Amino acid sequence: MSTEPSKTLETFENPNPERDYTIRMEIPEFTCLCPKTGQPDFATLNLEYIPERHCVELKSLKLYIWSYRDVGGFHEALTNQILGDLVAATQPRYMKLTAHFNVRGGIWTTVEAEHHGR
């Protein structure tokens, strides 16, 4: 597996697909670029999901998150793009992504996006 940023999300088979259980991940080092100023934006991402048949592989998730370092985008658009890519890769029963962006201009921004499967 590569150590370079990548838009590829790898998965593995859910070891207990007959059961609902929740996977929670905290990703404290998300960075992207402000589309207006080009300055870096920093966020902590909280991912919560109930898998169906596949779970996201952690190293590929890390490399995927790194791939946003030089990407410009509004907080709302990037949060929904990441959720959409994760849903496409894993097809979960439920998934929620919460992005807690650091203060910019005296304003903290939190964006929550959800997917309800089944």
Swiss-Prot record:
Keywords: Cytoplasm, NADP, Oxidoreductase, Queuosine biosynthesis. It comes from the Bacteria. Pfam families: QueF. Substrate binds at residues 56-58, 75-76. SUPFAM superfamilies: Tetrahydrobiopterin biosynthesis enzymes-like. The active site is at 34 (thioimide intermediate), 41 (proton donor). It is an enzyme of class 1 (oxidoreductase). GO terms for cellular component: cytoplasm. The keyword NADP applies. The keyword Cytoplasm applies. It catalyses: 7-aminomethyl-7-carbaguanine + 2 NADP(+) = 7-cyano-7-deazaguanine + 2 NADPH + 3 H(+). Its main location: cytoplasm. Signal peptide: none annotated. It is found in: Cytoplasm. Belongs to the GTP cyclohydrolase I family. QueF type 1 subfamily. This is NADPH-dependent 7-cyano-7-deazaguanine reductase. The lineage of its organism: Bacteria, Pseudomonadati, Pseudomonadota, Gammaproteobacteria, Chromatiales. The gene is queF.
